[in-house]
């Protein structure tokens, strides 16, 4: 059974976003879109209202690391 993820699970979210959007450069994604992408992940159980700029930055950087590794 997949593990439920929250806003603080940046690394796992980054992995899942890379799997879902392998050709999308994370640095080109606006935070409003990133927020939507995260809240639509099937394992995400966090409160959509609890995101912060810092959490979104951490997720974006974790996703970017996965993106770079896949290139």
What are these regions (language model features)?
Residues 2-71:
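A charge-rich, low-complexity, intrinsically flexible signal that marks solvent-exposed coils, linkers
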